[in-house]
Amino acid sequence: PLNNIYLVATSAMDLFRAIDGIDSIRLSGTQENGWYIQEAKDAMESGKMIYAGKYNAPDYELILDEGCGLAIESTMIHHNPEVEEKLEQFGIPVMVERSSYESHPLGRTEWMKLYAVLLGKEDVAEKAFKEQTDKLDKVLTSDDKDTGKTVAFFYINSTGAVNVRKNGDYVSNMIELAGGKYVPEDTGESDNALSTMNMQMEEFYAKAKDADYIIYNSTIDGELSTIDELLAKS
């Protein structure tokens, strides 16, 4: 089983948590205050996990000193191929995490099975994955699975534009699977690697103002506590 993993792909942390594998991660590409997963924050606070630089500026000396067995990168590494080459020159294998390309939520979840193979935790992953599929089956077979409720999921970027998910993206799929209806409806399919698109506030408001629920994507832009904070961004 692998140890002293350098985890740069943040989306993989929750999958490692699900298979009780966080102890195998020694090096983080995200600082403590950037983690929303409590187990990761706790590991960094205790010193079990340490910051080793982000994807485009890793601390090579630290990574080597810690005996890193594998670097798990996000697709952002393709913007800095020299980093991947340097890690491999040092004898550190690099894996690019591509779960974000999965359009179905269970497709993303199933990546835990890959990490389980690396850690020798296949049985744990099979059990955890079945728990998730059972939960989804329960929803899909429910008599009232179609709620008719509309849901908007978005954040406002630094230019004031509204970033929304495209139809067919895993977030919009999760909303549909849960019995909701994603709005705006006409955001197009994910016909390329980008699963999001920007639209002007006026257009977004016209299409989403009657949504039953609005979900602000705080993982990108930070949390909002009040409606006034949201209005200030617009």
Predicted regions and their residues:
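Flexible, glycine-rich surface segments
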Residues: T141-D228
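Sec-exported extracytoplasmic/periplasmic mature domains
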Residues: L7-T10, R17-G21, D65-C68, E88-I92, ...
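Solvent-exposed loop/turn segments at secondary-structure junctions
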Residues: I5, S11-D14, Q31-G34, P58, ...
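Solvent-exposed, acidic/flexible segments
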Residues: V8-A9, A18, G53-A57, M76-N80, ...
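Extracytoplasmic substrate-binding proteins
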Residues: K48, E61, D65-I72, H78-A161
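A short, gly/pro- and small-residue-rich
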Residues: G21-I25, V83-R98, L224-S234
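A short, structured surface patch at a secondary-structure boundary
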Residues: P1-L64, L70-M76
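Short beta-strand and adjacent tight-turn residues that come in two discontinuous sequence segments
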Residues: L27, E73, E97, E185, ...
